[in-house]
Amino acid sequence: MDGLFAPIPSNPLIDFTILLLVTLILPPIFERLKLPGLVGLLFAGIVLGKSGLGVLNEDSESIKLFTDIGKIYLMFVAGLEIDMVDFRRTRNRSLLYGSLTFAVPLLTGLAVGLTFGYSFNASVLLGSLFASHTLLGYPIVQRLGIVRNQAVMVTIGATIFTDIAALLVLAICISIHSGSFSPAGLVVQLVAIAVYSALVLIGFDWAGREYFRRTGDEQSNQFLFVLLAVFLASVGSELINVDKIVGAFLAGLAVNDVLGNSPVKEKVEFLGTTLFIPFFFIGIGLLLDLPAFLVTLTTLFPLVVAIVVGLILSKGVAAILAQWKLGYTWVEGLTMWSLSIPQVAATLAAAVAGYQAVNAAGDRLVSETVLNTIIVLMLITSIVGPLMTAKFAPKIPIPNTLSSLTEDLDDPEENGAVTLIPPKASTFTVLVPTQNPQTLSYLLEMGALIARHESGVVIPLAIAKAPVHMDDPGLTSRLARNELLLQQATELATNLKVDAHPALRIDDDVARAISHTAREKNADLIIMGWSQQTLGLRAKLFGSTIDSVFWSAHCPVAVMRLLSDPRSFHRILFPIKNLTPQTLELFQFTQRLAETNGAIVTLLHVCPHNTSPQQVQAFKTEMERFLNQCRATADYPIKVICHDDAAKVLVRVSHTFDLVVLRSFRRRSVGGVALGEVTDKILREITSSFVLFGDPYA
């Protein structure tokens, strides 16, 4: 239809600007309405497309490019987010559950398609759309501390099998639909897919490791390498007549181990989740014909019900069969079911690929009716799945990680390189950068107290920014100023009866100077000052000094905001989310802080409001065992509060404490210092002193 804004010229710049504006404004509005942000993007696509104002044209080259990149990025991130370490631990069980949660929904979708008169090929593709799933409930189980539960790990691992199998079925169905299918051709196609998959999974993994090893800390080039890998794999898949999303997903799996939890991964995901993936969802809205969509919901309502109910029930049957075969509890089986319900990433990308597959007769493999129904399915399952996870997952007991703690620590490679601070034969060394004179006094005092407790030394570090020429007059003045700072720091340490070994570096990168000096001096701990700018947009886009030190340092890093003399800290709050080896390390650090002043450490755990009294008591018992594992000699009060807003509780409780100890979680962020959502909110609102602790590779 001719839109109201038809006079506006259509060009890539205008299209891109509109897409950015929509991506920025609409998702937060819909989230305030308790709806997923992607619903807002779909709504925007409908309003701006042919069924609304006609501002954006889905057939324009720029829109096609943006949505294609978004689709590729969506599948790449889906492969990148799979935890390969957990998958390797449970691969046999994951294969069993993956086979069940693929086969049962596939057969169900096939039956639904044939019942409603679709061809066998289209019905098989419909079944494959049922088979995959998106782990929208992962943040819930992660918040509850049950990610290490075997049933949850198996469900996560099964995602690899379901997504790969569904994408392979898509490739075959598109080949058949194009008319180029024959038994011999199918064999050739399968061989080509197998060879191509091996080249991507093995070749890209090897190339990535070699490139990252040779480039060291050159994150910009590594970032470009990852982008090249994604799009090269996508182009390669099209060369063998397989949809580009297959290559993107395989590329995500291939570079998964190479990236680990590095800053490069965070920035790659940041680019996709904030820019290109939202464009894909807007593009889906542009494809929707609103009158046809309403017709689907009314005249073809039985098809909608059959697809939605068939998907949910088939996933339930697969979960029950796996629960029975693997010996899990009913609650674990129901949680597996809830996690496998949401249909977003692979499902939607495959549905769009099928919709865009047109044969010589002009027929689409996935009809407009089915595409509309799949969108309804996505909306319903993306809401129902997480709601069910939130209902069933809290009933799963938190895994008893203490029983296997020693085994995990003995194998740091298997456990994500956990590095407890062991007693060393050499002198305990604390490194304190002196970049900010206003915070130097308290930071150095804290470092000296810890070093004195360990009969160690403190290294005040001053860094002069390196100019192009070493005879620059500005460098001379900076060196003089830094030498004065080091002299003051040495006097302060001497007053606290601690040996100080000052160090002065000339470097053009502050973070690199800190991490290199720490390694050269064999430091056991780095203490830095907190900057509120670390939470700003610039830091999230480009990183910060704190972020870089967190990622590059060989030893634990403690970033502190100290509002008073550290010797006055007598009440320390230690929030404890779940019992892991990393928690043990952080608690050991907190013990050190407490013992320097004879402070009392209070352990606080915030659990969901619907947690049963039995579960609360069980967690208290686990924490008591945890303290015994730490060989705690003092009494440590334990608090458990049931509330759904952990950040709000922690901020409120922190008012009565002198110091709060928090951890930097790298996994769940997209840029800057990687913080959990709760930690990020706490740091923005907390009014007391705090320590943000990060250990290498965590």
Curated annotation (Swiss-Prot):
Gene3D superfamilies: 1.20.1530.20, 3.40.50.12370. Keywords: Antiport, Ion transport, Membrane, Sodium, Sodium transport, Transmembrane, Transmembrane helix, Transport. It is a multi-pass membrane protein. It is found in: Membrane. Signal peptide: none annotated. InterPro entries: Cation/H_exchanger_TM (IPR006153), Na+/solute_symporter_sf (IPR038770), UspA (IPR006016). GO terms for cellular component: membrane. One of its GO terms (biological process) is proton transmembrane transport. It holds the Pfam family Usp. CDD domains: USP_NhaS5_C (cd01988). The chain crosses the membrane at residues 10-30, 35-55, 65-85, 100-120, 121-141, 156-176, 184-204, 222-242, 275-295, 300-320, 333-353, 370-390. GO terms for molecular function: antiporter activity. Its main location: membrane. PANTHER family: NA(+)_H(+) ANTIPORTER NHAS5, NAPA-TYPE SODIUM/HYDROGEN ANTIPORTER. Na(+)/H(+) antiporter. Belongs to the monovalent cation:proton antiporter 2 (CPA2) transporter (TC 2.A.37) family. This is Na(+)/H(+) antiporter NhaS5. It comes from Synechocystis sp. (strain ATCC 27184 / PCC 6803 / Kazusa).
